[in-house]
Amino acid sequence: MSQNTQTLLITGSAGFIGSNLVLRLLDSQEPLSIVGLDNLNDYYDPSLKEYRLSVIQKKVDTAQRHTYHFIKGDLADKALIDRLFAENRFDIVVNLAAQAGVRYSIENPDAYIQSNMIGFYNILEACRHSYDGIPGSTETGNPGYQGVQHLVYASSSSVYGGNKKVPFSTDDRVDNPVSLYAATKKSNELFAHCYSKLYNIPTTGLRFFTVYGPAGRPDMAYFGFTNKLLKGQTIQIYNYGNCRRDFTYVDDIVEGIVRVMRKAPEKKTGEDGLPIPPYAVYNIGGGQPENLLDFVNILQEELVRAGVLPKDYDFEAHKQLVPMQPGDVPTTYADASALERDFGFTPKITLREGLRKFAEWYKEYYQ
């Protein structure tokens, strides 16, 4: 590997977004040394995670300028995290590992505290200590190493809670979470700001809005609905279909991550002589919220088109309109103007395009 090779840590690399990010990075022109970390837990079918890893491995086998090394491990294992940082000297860290799911956080709160809070703290501490021995850097074992140059981490649109004002802006207050999952994600932003202020670590949080696409998470509506319809089961549509979601295709999410990670917040000194926190938060969302019933209709059409379901499938007999669930919100709607301003990027994939790609993948993978 060249001396100019950047070393990256991608946590949650067998997850939906993480695996797609690794695949995207393996197409990069500049040489990269990528370490992927994932605990491969059974929150959903681990075989889907193994499938994603196999797709990555096929690409790694033909990669000319990159290396990729996967490690099975947990963010909450501080000794493991510290060892990884000591051995690899990461330039960029993208933390996508987390216990996901709003409703699941009501049933299993411990998993969220361990992964989303303690795990994120371990990452922050490791980033902090990556600066040990700098300047001088004789203690680092790599005279040119300058510590972690950028920590990018997954936040969530759920931090907006029950906010009534739409679209959701990063300037809005986000101190009224309606689920433990949302509270842990907001805590990540607070932790990151603290470490940016105290230790001058450049951090950027990304609030993702309803990510979907091929090989996604089976607990997400589009995937779960497909599984149930195929089995002849009834799908439940919350808030009697009056929810709106800002669906964002996974490739758009990944493109946003790649652009952001390459441009860290600038380190500056304030008038008091102390560092101005090199800290930022952005929304990544399509900015076009879809009514849940319209979303279901498009999904149905694309499942029929792909041959997942027959043309004469009785969809009306398999729908049930039900009340809002605890922890849910009626609307998510991203104001992503800051992302466009600073990085020249706006999500582009339409809901129909994205669901078509999902339906075609589903047909190939399961049938």
Name each model feature, range by range.
Residues 1-211, 298:
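N-terminal Rossmann-like NAD(P)+-binding domain of SDR-like oxidoreductases, especially those catalyzing
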Residues 7, 24, 64-65, 122, ...:
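C-terminal substrate-binding subdomain of Rossmann-fold SDR/epimerase-dehydratase oxidoreductases
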Residues 17, 221, 291:
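Conserved alpha-helical elements of sugar-nucleotide-dependent glycosyltransferases
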Residues 34, 47, 106, 202-205, ...:
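Non-catalytic, surface-exposed connector residues within folded enzymatic/regulatory domains
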Residues 80, 111, 118, 173, ...:
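Residue-level recognition of oxygen-bearing side chains
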Residues 210, 216, 243-245:
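Heptad-repeat alpha-helical coiled-coil signaling segments
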